[in-house]
Structure formats: structure tokens, C-alpha cells
Amino acid sequence: MTSFSIEAPAKVNLTLHVVGKRDDGYHLLDSLVVFAGIGDTLEFSPAETLSLEVTGPTASQIPDGENIVLKAARLLAEATGVTKGAAIRLTKRLPVAAGIGGGSADAAAALKGLMRLWGVAPPAETLRRVALSIGADVPVCLAGTPMRMMGVGEVLEPAPTLPPAWLVLVNPLVPLHTPPVFKARTGPFSAADPLTAPPRDAKGLAEALAARRNDLTPPAITIEPVVGEVLAAIAATADCLLPRMSGSGATCFGLYAEEAQARAAAAQLGAAHPAWWIAPAQLLS
């Protein structure tokens, strides 16, 4: 088999309600998850041993130690009895610890690519178990389409059909790790409030999202006040239908109806904040 590549698109939480907490300390979520037309790329080649090369604009942000891609590879090999290797090349474009599932998307792409490379097709339940053992966002990234994500990430339902729309992703290049954000959350839990009807257009989607929220935004701003600055900067761009934080931050996004509007907003933000990571991207449906 020759080499091939698989994309690992950014995950975006359009909504994120914290609805409860398990006895083991894990929080229960109800989240509308979509994917953006920007991400990392994984290239797979046959090899006798398992290896990973990381390149790309944000490769230097990856901490030393075992990469989540290698973890995914080893867990899949254990679950399927595979003894083959693979040469994996990860081109890293997404910022790390950013709330857009970069590592989880990479792990999901690794599972997809290695199943193809190794010629294995584990049962759906086995694959789900492997994905969840890697990380809470890996199952939804493995699905790769708009989903309502519940539980700790293991319960997935297809989302209503979403209209064409564009996003501008903005990260101030401040890593914001998930556990401290959850720990800083205060107040009662939210009710689940899923999107049930397909919005008619991007404006309708923004209206539906505005009636919901990301419960992790206040604690994220408490830890890193720059998140509030990012949201304000996005809100100030022309044609922005909605500014919001994704996941546990620090990446935020603006929602726009048209590509030209998103690109103009990204240019405006980039001129004002050259040190931030800014990327316009289509909302993938």
C-alpha cells in the first residue's frame, strides 16, 4: 500500500451546557459539536515499526512525551491484535490546549488511517471503547459530522441539518487546560437544551445559539481574562452574527453568513492582533 493522508478538522462547540457531575468527578455535558474546514493532516505509510514525525506551524507547541497519536495507535493495535507498524507524519496547524479538539481530532484521524493501513475493521463497540479511552472528544471527532454530544462525550446523536455558514477561529495563543476550567466553574448545573429544528439560514442558527451558551466561558475568563478580550474583538467585527468560546477555551469563534464576511473579519482581527492565531473556515455540514 502506498502512502495516503487523512484530515483532522478542528472541533467547535457551538453550545456547551454542563448538566451534571458523576460520582467520579467527571462532568456531564450537552453540546452541539461541529467541525471547521481547517485542521491538521496525518500521512500514513507502511513500516515495520511505529513512528511519528511532527511538523507544521504549531508543532513546537506539542509537549514532550507520548503523543496522543501514538497512544491511539497502540490502543488500536492492542484491541485488534495487529503487530504491524506505521510511519505517521503529523502536520500540526491547530494550536494546542485550545478548546478545538486538535489532539482529539488527530487521534480520531489516526484510528481511521491505521484501520485502513492495517486492513482491520473492529466492531463498532470496540472502536467506541478505544476512542473514549483516548479522550472524551475522540468519539465525536471520529464521527466527524455535526453531533449532539452528551454524557462525558460517549453519547452521540446526529444534529439537525445546519445551514451554510462560516467561522472565524481566534486563539490568543494562551494554552488553557480543561481540568482547571471545570474546577473553576460555579453555580447550578444547566438544563439540557438541544437544537431540535434545522435553522433556516446562518442568521437563524445564530438566533438559536444565542438562546443557549457555553457554560465554561465565565471560568475560562476568570483563569485567562484575555478570553474576554478575544470575544469582544470578534463581536466588534462587521457582520458577526455571534461570538462564542469553543470547548474550555481559549479558542473563540465568530459566526458569519458568507465567506467574504468571514475573511474580512479575519483580516481585521489579524491587523489589530498580529500575535493571535486567526483562521477563517467553513462550517462543515
UniProtKB/Swiss-Prot annotation:
Gene3D superfamilies: 3.30.230.10, GHMP kinase, C-terminal domain
A biological-process GO annotation: isopentenyl diphosphate biosynthetic process, methylerythritol 4-phosphate pathway
GO MF terms held by the record: 4-(cytidine 5'-diphospho)-2-C-methyl-D-erythritol kinase activity; ATP binding
Pathway annotation: Isoprenoid biosynthesis; isopentenyl diphosphate biosynthesis via DXP pathway; isopentenyl diphosphate from 1-deoxy-D-xylulose 5-phosphate: step 3/6
Keyword set includes NAD: no
Family affiliation: Belongs to the GHMP kinase family. IspE subfamily.
Binding residues for ATP: P95, V96, A97, A98, G99, I100, G101, G102, G103, S104, A105
Active-site residues (renumbered): K11, D137
InterPro entries per UniProt: GHMP_kinase_C_dom, GHMP_kinase_C_sf, GHMP_kinase_N_dom, IspE, Ribosomal_Su5_D2-typ_SF, Ribsml_uS5_D2-typ_fold_subgr
Function text: Catalyzes the phosphorylation of the position 2 hydroxy group of 4-diphosphocytidyl-2C-methyl-D-erythritol.
Protein's UniProt name: 4-diphosphocytidyl-2-C-methyl-D-erythritol kinase
Residue spans crossing the bilayer: none
Pfam family, one: GHMP_kinases_N
Domain of life assignment: Bacteria
Catalysis: reaction(s): 4-CDP-2-C-methyl-D-erythritol + ATP = 4-CDP-2-C-methyl-D-erythritol 2-phosphate + ADP + H(+)
Keywords: ATP-binding, Isoprene biosynthesis, Kinase, Nucleotide-binding, Transferase
Designated gene of the protein: ispE
Organism of derivation: Paramagnetospirillum magneticum (strain ATCC 700264 / AMB-1) (Magnetospirillum magneticum)
Family matches, as SUPFAM superfamilies: GHMP Kinase, C-terminal domain, Ribosomal protein S5 domain 2-like
Assigned EC number: 2.7.1.148
Keyword ATP-binding: yes
